Each structure stands twice: as structure tokens, then as C-alpha cells.
């Protein structure tokens, strides 16, 4: 006679998990903590939180959001004699401007070309000057500049003339925002001397408004001395913005 308490294959009781086994599975499935005690995604030692690396860093805007026109005028290879021999590098000449009457030039040296250009660009941004423009397209009056053996002549031009300039001088006027000008350079073809002479001539530019304030007169009075009628002088004086 079979024992009534014996269990057959079909009458096996359900197995129950021991508390130790349940805790072991939960512990094995839990994420590992960082070295500092925090989780992988947070906590003090986490990758994205606490003292971890910040990913929301923004680059500094050195120009205050202003868009500048950058012109690479000249680049040449230079060498420096040191105790162990010669050390070669590159020198760059860059002109920058906002196209609205401000421009500057800079010179930079480095072992690599991109670094030399970046140095020259940074120097040009720090040396920008304001040049008054007539109608926002040409110079108010003629001017001359001199540096080294170079002499440059700048002349204002009527609308539609364009930029009559070559080489380094064209880059200056394009970045400055001048649309009509006639220039001439004699004495040198060195781009450094030409650029410096050009900026010397631009630095001497004055507007009728500044001259009138310095003399204590009206702008129309200065224009009438050029032979213009009263009505034409007043209309031209009203059009002067700087």
C-alpha cells in the first residue's frame, strides 16, 4: 500500500526562493557605484554629476557676436638662428574689418601656419581703428601715407568707380567697407610697408562734422566754402552721418 504522504512526479510542491537568494539576485542586478560613491550617471563620483566633467561649457565670444571680415594678405617662411642651429617658422600678415568703417592689421609668427594666422588675427582685432566714410562707400577727402620706402596716395571717387587698388591695399578697403576709391603706391612692393602706409593715410581721414565741431561752425558753412549753393550745402550737410 503506497504511502499517502509520498509525492509523485505530478504532485511536487512549488519551490520557494530563500530570502538570501532573492537578495543576492537584486544585488547582482543593481548598477555599480562609482569610485566616489555615486552612480554612473550621477552622484559625487558620477561621470555627469557632482564633481564630474561639465558638458555645458560654451566657447567665449571674443568679438561680442560681431562678424568680421578677415583677409590673409601675406605669409612667408622665417628662420631664427639658435645655439643648436636654425629654427624655421612662418609669419602671417592679416587684415580684419567689419565692413562698416572699422579695420586693423596684425602680424604673427609661429611654427605652424594656422597658429601664425590666428596670432595675426588676434593682433589685428586689438588694433582696429575707425575711419569716417562718406555715404558709407568712399573717403571724405584725399590722403597720403608714408612708411619706409613706400608712399601711397588715396583719393575719393564717385559712385560706380570701384576699388582701384592692388594687392595688399585692396584687402584693406574690402575689409573696411569702401566701395569706391582710387589708390596708388610707389617706392616699394613690400606688403608690410604698403599696409602700414595705407593705415597711416586712413588715420588722417576726418569728416566734415568733426571739423565743424572743432572750429565751432556748421557743416553747411564748410561745404559752402567749396563753391556750393546754400541749398546744395544744406542738403549735403544733412546727408553727412559721421
From Swiss-Prot:
Molecular function terms, GO-annotated: rRNA binding; structural constituent of ribosome
InterPro entries: Ribosomal_Su5_D2-typ_SF (IPR020568), Ribosomal_uS5 (IPR000851), Ribosomal_uS5_bac-type (IPR005712), Ribosomal_uS5_C (IPR005324), Ribosomal_uS5_N (IPR013810), Ribosomal_uS5_N_CS (IPR018192), Ribsml_uS5_D2-typ_fold_subgr (IPR014721)
GO CC annotations, alphabetized: small ribosomal subunit
Region called Disordered, residue ranges: 1-65, 204-242
Endpoints of the signal sequence: none
Ranges of biased composition (kind: Polar residues): 1-14
This protein's UniProt keywords: Ribonucleoprotein, Ribosomal protein, RNA-binding, rRNA-binding
Origin superkingdom: Bacteria
Gene Ontology biological process terms in this record: translation
Every S5 DRBM domain range: 68-131
Biased composition (Basic and acidic residues): 41-65, 218-234
Pfam families: Ribosomal_S5, Ribosomal_S5_C
Domains as described in the record: The N-terminal domain interacts with the head of the 30S subunit; the C-terminal domain interacts with the body and contacts protein S4. The interaction surface between S4 and S5 is involved in control of translational fidelity.
Subunit structure: Part of the 30S ribosomal subunit. Contacts proteins S4 and S8.
Family designation: Belongs to the universal ribosomal protein uS5 family.
PANTHER family xrefs: MITOCHONDRIAL RIBOSOMAL PROTEIN S5
Protein role: With S4 and S12 plays an important role in translational accuracy. Located at the back of the 30S subunit body where it stabilizes the conformation of the head with respect to the body.
Protein name per UniProt: Small ribosomal subunit protein uS5
Source organism of this protein record: Sphingopyxis alaskensis (strain DSM 13593 / LMG 18877 / RB2256) (Sphingomonas alaskensis)
Gene name as annotated: rpsE
Amino acid at each position: 500500500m503506497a504511502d499517502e504522504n509520498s509525492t509523485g512526479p505530478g504532485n511536487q510542491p512549488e519551490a520557494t526562493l530563500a530570502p538570501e537568494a532573492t537578495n543576492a539576485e537584486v544585488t547582482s542586478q543593481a548598477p555599480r557605484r562609482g569610485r566616489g560613491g555615486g552612480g554612473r550617471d550621477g552622484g559625487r563620483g558620477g561621470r555627469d554629476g557632482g564633481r564630474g566633467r561639465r558638458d555645458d561649457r560654451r566657447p567665449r565670444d571674443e568679438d561680442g557676436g560681431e562678424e568680421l571680415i578677415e583677409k590673409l594678405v601675406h605669409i612667408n617662411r622665417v628662420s631664427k638662428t639658435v645655439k643648436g642651429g636654425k629654427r624655421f617658422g612662418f609669419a602671417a600678415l592679416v587684415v580684419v574689418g567689419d565692413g562698416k568703417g572699422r579695420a586693423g592689421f596684425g602680424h604673427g609668427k609661429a611654427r605652424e601656419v594656422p597658429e601664425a594666422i590666428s596670432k595675426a588675427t588676434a593682433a589685428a582685432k586689438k588694433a582696429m581703428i575707425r575711419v569716417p566714410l562718406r555715404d558709407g562707400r568712399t573717403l571724405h577727402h584725399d590722403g597720403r601715407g608714408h612708411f619706409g620706402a613706400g608712399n601711397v596716395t588715396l583719393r575719393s571717387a564717385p559712385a560706380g568707380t570701384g576699388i582701384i587698388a592692388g594687392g595688399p591695399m585692396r584687402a584693406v578697403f574690402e575689409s573696411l567697407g569702401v566701395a569706391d576709391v582710387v589708390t596708388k603706391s610707389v617706392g616699394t612692393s613690400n606688403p608690410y610697408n604698403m599696409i602700414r602706409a595705407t593705415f597711416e593715410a586712413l588715420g588722417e581721414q576726418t569728416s566734415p562734422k568733426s571739423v565743424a565741431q572743432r572750429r565751432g561752425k556748421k557743416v553747411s558753412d564748410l561745404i559752402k566754402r567749396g563753391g556750393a549753393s546754400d541749398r546744395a550745402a544744406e542738403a549735403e550737410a544733412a546727408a553727412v552721418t559721421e
